[in-house]
Regions:
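Non-heme di-metal
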Residues: 1-65
Length: 65
């Protein structure tokens, strides 16, 4: 996989973060133990923050948020 621009790299990273959100949300839905469900939900929220940070980079925001 090759990238020609910084924007392509960031867009790729955003997609991977969104996939991670989906993964952790699905894991949370399937998890019978409350402590593990909460852990997966926390992971999903962190991945959402990462995606927002990267989207901010695309908008030219220095901090990304």
């Amino acid at each position: 996989m090759g990238f020609d621009t910084f924007e392509e790299i960031i867009r790729y990273a955003i997609e991977r973060e969104k996939e991670a959100v989906d993964f952790y949300e699905e894991a949370s839905r399937l998890e019978p133990y409350a402590w593990a469900k909460e852990t997966f939900e926390g992971f999903a929220k962190e991945e959402q923050k990462h995606a927002a940070l990267l989207e901010g980079f695309l908008k030219g925001e220095k901090s990304g948020v």
